[in-house]
Amino acid sequence: MTMAKLFDKVIGIMGFADDDYEDDYFEEEEEKEEVREETRGTGNRKGAQVVSIHTQKQIKVVVMEPQAFEDSQSIADQLRNRRPVIVNLENAERNLAKRIVDFVSGATYALGGNMQKVGNGIFLFVPNNVDISGEMKDDFKEKGFFWSLTK
């Protein structure tokens, strides 16, 4: 130990030491620690925006019961607007129902969508942003596509 350090230690024990140097040192360290804590908390993200990752849009299903062939265009418009459509043709005459299904299925194909028969005279037409799971293709093979449209 050098003579200067020994002298400073003795003076410190007696209470005559210069505490200003130590106080300044500890104050600087405390300020540095506060700055570190502040930057850790914010992560240096000034101007950052929080964006929700829940982007799933609620899809509405349109149910239509066309009375005339002209109604088939409004069904196609719904598909073009990316809305699934359930078409109820139970009360339509056979020729009209066949024409509507032909027109809407063509529009569905042109838009990249799909169709599914879900019941007697009831069809589901969906745009390309909707998938249909579960199929009833066995009924189509056995009874034909329009077997339930007879009156």
Curated annotation (Swiss-Prot):
It comes from the Bacteria. Its main location: cytoplasm. One of its GO terms (biological process) is division septum assembly. It is found in: Cytoplasm. Keywords: Cell cycle, Cell division, Cytoplasm, Septation. One of its GO terms (cellular component) is cytoplasm. Belongs to the SepF family. Cell division protein that is part of the divisome complex and is recruited early to the Z-ring. Probably stimulates Z-ring formation, perhaps through the cross-linking of FtsZ protofilaments. Its function overlaps with FtsA. Homodimer. Interacts with FtsZ. PANTHER family: CELL DIVISION PROTEIN SEPF (PTHR35798:SF1). HAMAP family: SepF. This is Cell division protein SepF. It comes from Desulfitobacterium hafniense (strain Y51). The gene is sepF.
